[in-house]
Amino acid sequence: MASCNLLVIQTTSIIMFSSLLSRPVNSSYDPSYHFSPVTREIKNDPTSNGVVSTTKNATPLAPSKYDTTIPLKKRYPNLVHNFPKPELDENVILETKKIIDSILNPSDEPTNDINYIKYENPNPNPNPNPNPNQEQQQQSSSSSSKIIQIKQFQEDPMLPPKFKLRKNRHERIIEDVTFVKDLKTKKLTKEDREFWNIPAAVSNWKNSQGFTIGLDKRMIGREHVPIEMNIEKFNDLSTALSDADLQAREDLKQRNEIRQQKQLQEKRLRDEKIKEIANRSKRRRY
């Protein structure tokens, strides 16, 4: 059949389907599911059930009121949509719960089995003159043995190593020392001492140690160095310096003259331009 019927329980409450709602995201779109509501008043029996018939090919009615243009989500904010929901997987829930519990409450269980050691008090009466109350306590403590519980927990792998790592050091091989000096001691003569004598560094400009040079040695040194004065080269140097000074002065003078000429030319062009503008303004007036 092309048409489908919808049952209305009461005349006051009517089930409404509207295209103003947004399209479902997780469902396929089928235009055959669109219905246009047709209202009908039941006058004979107000308590009887009414039927609202809709057809697939019926033309939608124009909205007669302003309320019909408002979306259902705004008109009925507490409207509950019974969309199909996937069933919950209990295995996934249990796994996630187990992981979260292990993160929030880390278990302090030992890695290996628990060991128990029985301990007895070796000194039942340590005090020589105890009180009667202390004697009773000591008797009860000595008679009752203690049991110590030993657990081995997992160590943190991020902790630094407890023991120092020794490198593979090789054994040091000590060889016999080879002496450069001759073992045969010889007596140093005066000639050898003079031959290996190194004089101190003495300068005419720098003498931090305060050494002095004898006059005889100074006079001997002056005789070997001839005193000469190169007058020709000194004359050439003085003439070259004077010529360079004159050339620099002439260059400065020429640069100043060229700069002054440029300034005068710019001033003349500026004055001519101003005069031309003034003449144009006078011509426009007359």
UniProtKB/Swiss-Prot annotation:
Protein's UniProt keywords contain Glycoprotein: no
Cellular-component GO terms for this entry: spliceosomal complex
Compartment list: Nucleus
Keywords, sorted A to Z: mRNA processing, mRNA splicing, Nucleus, Spliceosome
Protein's GO biological process: filamentous growth of a unicellular organism; mRNA splicing, via spliceosome
Pfam families in the record: SKIP_SNW
Top-rank taxon: Eukaryota
Bias (Basic and acidic residues): 253-279
Extent of Low complexity compositional bias: 132-145
Function: Involved in pre-mRNA splicing.
Quaternary structure (record): Associated with the spliceosome.
Protein name as it appears in the record: Pre-mRNA-processing protein 45
Organism of derivation: Candida albicans (strain SC5314 / ATCC MYA-2876)
